[in-house]
A protein has these predicted regions:
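Small-residue-biased structural context
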Residues: 3-155
Length: 155
């Protein structure tokens, strides 16, 4: 007999294709996927809004730290598309902030927001992050120690 327990299916699965070859960044991306799935699971389970909004706040904070780490790495390696990449980060932060404010006002997080999180992160990793990772790994030896030192400061 069924116990009434609903197992939520993850909104976003981590896939090998998301691995960039920068261990620290890959781990942070896995954490972002995990946070998105925690929010999704909280929605599916009809958790209290305070739980859902706390998770969104956690996602916002983690994302800001992650973006700062990525942007520092890009600056340190003189990544030529830095401004464009940083703008993508800023647009993401603005959209999440807007959606969160709307959700707090209405008491409901839109499914569009969840799909946006999943789609944006997947595409951003596969396209934009892949470009800067490939760029920074071209001078791998020189940048590895730089990258390790950088991430000890952030995480």
């Amino acid at each position: 007999s069924r116990t009434g327990i609903c197992m939520a299916i993850a909104l976003m699965a981590w896939e090998e294709k998301f691995c960039l070859g920068l261990d620290e960044i890959d781990e942070q991306h896995k954490s972002l996927v995990d946070l998105i799935n925690q929010i999704w699971e909280s929605i599916i389970k009809k958790s209290d809004n305070s739980v859902i909004f706390a998770l969104i706040g956690e996602l916002e904070k983690y994302t800001l730290a992650h973006f700062a780490a990525e942007e520092t790495l890009m600056r340190m390696t003189d990544y030529p598309a830095f401004d464009k990449h940083k703008k993508e980060h800023q647009d993401f932060v603005a959209r999440v902030s807007e959606e969160k404010a709307q959700a707090e006002a209405t008491g409901q997080l839109s499914l569009d927001m969840m799909y946006f999180l999943r789609n944006w992160l997947g595409e951003h990793i596969l396209i934009s992050d892949k470009h800067y990772a490939d760029y920074s790994l071209r001078n791998k030896k020189e940048n590895r120690s730089l990258i390790s030192r950088l991430f000890r400061r952030f995480f």
